[in-house]
Amino acid sequence: MDWYKEPPMWTVDGSTITMRSGPKTDFWRTTHYGFIRDNVHFYYRHVADDFLVEVKVGGAYTALYDQAGLMVRVDEANWIKCGIEFVDGVQQVSAVVTREYSDWSVAPLPSNPAALWLRLTRHGSAIEIRYALDGVQYQMLRLAYFIPSETMSAGLMCASPDGAGFTVTFEGLTIQSK
């Protein structure tokens, strides 16, 4: 696996990957805020055709917009990130679909869970995002069109747009062809 914007601290211990995000890191393009950010920490590998990415993620979210989860990326203007994002003092399950402009959706999670399981699946030109609180009963968060591309990058991301950084743990990362 490779890094796009390696974080200040990261370790791998078996199937557990721990990272500490740097301050002022984010992926965002234009919508509402008028700025472009392209410096999130992204640990990825290249994938082709249809694929599935799964992981369990937990973090010490404290600052507004602290975020961690999964990401797929074709280039700086075409990407999707999903996971937990800390908004209004609450952990939210979050998805941002970007095709030149970012489109963000969130839903509050019950009682700031210690961890969240994420599953992102590519089916042709569609990306399906699901999440579970227990690792078993997955709910759909988003089904989105995504630009056709023979290959793209898929993996883990974390960022701290407003905060000084936070620590996040990913467990059991799976990236497989379908």
Model-derived regions: residue spans:
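Extracellular glycan-recognition regions
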Residues: 1-178
